[in-house]
């Protein structure tokens, strides 16, 4: 069994075979999923490397424990004479440039691939050892790019544009997810009236979360005679939640879109509340002198100040959350259903089957593979009849995610003094989250108002 396992893993690393787990008690995996998880693993490796590079103490530790390191830098000129370019925001820019080029290359390589038996599909699904070497070579080669100042300046604007597009894709998916959720559960009310209770309960919970969240932020992030900017922010966002709720149930919208309702607006309101909270926690601390002449932080909760004192815990928890969120966004936005949602392609309402877990396919899907699961190999080749997701679009999303990670880790446009302890706070981070919040509201309103403005055009929502 061990020899067979080693042969299988060797074929996975150096050939086109799919990857799997060796132990007999481990579940079998579909090739389409293992491929995406392997690319995600490479992506997380590079993020971890970037986080290390943003840690100020790393360079000192490396110089102290590796005697030939400084001499190596002088000879290769890869990190400057004193290796100063191997850490900090410039190093993250270079490493993320290499990772972005890696995914851009595979995006072009897999264009128009619809058959998993093609040569390019074999390259996409296998040869993991050689792809790891290629990724390492691209990230390392970025340190030898001439005219570093021009490169960093141009790449910064490319990163900002790509990050904006990545955020737009995620916001579009959230809006379309809300519409799909309501449409699926509403379809269930035709056969079972209990779906009305489910719709009402979930809607009530989401509005309770949104109202409660805004109320708690008003208590902890404002003061009676200060924090006017926070008060205005909470008032505006609360007003936006009320606006989208009224528009969603207005008669003119209901005539054109009978499936529009409070479930979608409740979900968007919850997301607006989350982004508002995230933005407020990202604002730089505001300090004033009290009556005793001591600096005190205002417009922030006391427990938040105590938490910020434990910088290591906040930093690493935030880093872990960042990795989880980006990984989830990349994987969920590259499925076939998500691609259809971005193009507003859905099944006919009469064909909708209401399910609690409506994100996944209906029961009985892929029955052929399930019947052979006990007899087949450790990998289920689920793309025999065609690809189950767009290879090129998958790599394009990871290309944009690479740019988003680069801008996030370097505090967007306040990159000079950025470290791993500061990339979750700052005015750039605050305004990016605010812009994301407003853009989400506008995208949702667009899906409601567009059919009214263009009555002759068919909108599938």
Curated annotation (Swiss-Prot):
Pfam families: Serinc. It catalyses: a 1,2-diacyl-sn-glycero-3-phospho-L-serine(in) = a 1,2-diacyl-sn-glycero-3-phospho-L-serine(out); a 1,2-diacyl-sn-glycero-3-phosphocholine(in) = a 1,2-diacyl-sn-glycero-3-phosphocholine(out); a 1,2-diacyl-sn-glycero-3-phosphoethanolamine(in) = a 1,2-diacyl-sn-glycero-3-phosphoethanolamine(out). Residues 58-90, 147-157, 222-231, 282-312, 414-422 are cytoplasmic. It is a multi-pass membrane protein. One of its GO terms (biological process) is antiviral innate immune response. It is found in: Cell membrane. GO terms for molecular function: acetyltransferase activator activity; phospholipid scramblase activity. Glycans are attached at residues 114, 184. Coiled coil: none annotated. PANTHER family: SERINE INCORPORATOR, SERINE INCORPORATOR 5. This is Serine incorporator 5. The gene is Serinc5.
């Amino acid at each position: 069994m061990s020899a067979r396992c080693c042969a299988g893993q060797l074929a996975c690393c150096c050939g086109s075979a799919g990857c799997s787990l060796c132990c007999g008690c481990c579940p079998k995996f579909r090739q389409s999923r293992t491929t995406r998880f392997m690319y995600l693993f490479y992506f997380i490796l590079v993020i971890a490397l970037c986080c290390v590079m943003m840690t100020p103490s790393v360079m000192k530790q490396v110089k102290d424990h590796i005697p030939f390191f400084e001499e190596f830098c002088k000879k290769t000129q890869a990190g400057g004479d004193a290796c100063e370019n191997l850490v900090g925001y410039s190093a993250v820019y270079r490493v993320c440039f290499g990772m972005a080029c890696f995914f851009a290359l595979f995006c072009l390589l897999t264009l128009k691939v619809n058959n998993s038996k093609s040569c390019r599909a074999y390259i996409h699904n296998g040869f993991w050892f050689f792809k790891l070497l290629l990724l390492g070579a691209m990230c390392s080669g970025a340190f030898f790019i001439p005219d570093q100042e021009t490169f960093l300046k141009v790449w910064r604007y490319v990163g900002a544009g790509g990050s904006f597009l990545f955020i737009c894709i995620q916001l579009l998916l959230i809006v379309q997810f809300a519409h799909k959720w309501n449409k699926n559960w509403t379809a269930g009310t035709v056969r079972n009236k209990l779906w009305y209770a489910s719709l009402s309960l979930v809607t009530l919970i989401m509005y309770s979360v949104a109202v409660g969240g805004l109320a708690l932020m008003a208590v902890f992030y404002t003061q009676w005679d200060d924090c006017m900017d926070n008060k205005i922010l909470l008032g505006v966002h609360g007003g936006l939640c009320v606006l989208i709720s009224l528009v969603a149930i207005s008669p003119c919208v209901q005539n054109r879109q009978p499936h529009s309702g409070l479930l979608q607006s409740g979900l968007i309101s919850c997301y607006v509340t989350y982004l508002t909270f995230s933005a407020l926690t990202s604002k730089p601390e505001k300090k004033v002198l009290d009556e005793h002449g001591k600096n005190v932080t205002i417009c922030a909760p006391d427990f938040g100040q105590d938490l910020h004192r434990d910088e290591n815990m906040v930093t690493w928890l935030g880093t872990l959350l960042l990795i989880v969120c980006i990984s989830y966004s990349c994987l969920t936005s590259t499925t076939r259903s998500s691609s259809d949602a971005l193009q507003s392609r859905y099944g006919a309402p009469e064909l909708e089957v209401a399910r609690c877990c409506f994100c996944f396919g209906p029961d009985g899907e892929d029955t052929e593979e399930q019947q052979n699961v006990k007899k087949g190999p450790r990998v289920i080749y689920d793309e025999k009849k065609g690809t189950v997701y767009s290879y090129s679009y998958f790599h394009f999303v990871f290309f944009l995610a690479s740019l988003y990670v680069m801008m996030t880790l370097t505090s967007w446009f306040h990159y000079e003094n950025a470290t791993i302890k500061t990339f979750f706070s700052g005015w750039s981070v605050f305004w990016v989250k605010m812009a994301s919040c407003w853009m989400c509201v506008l995208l949702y309103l667009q899906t409601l108002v567009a059919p009214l403005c263009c009555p002759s055009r068919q909108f599938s929502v």
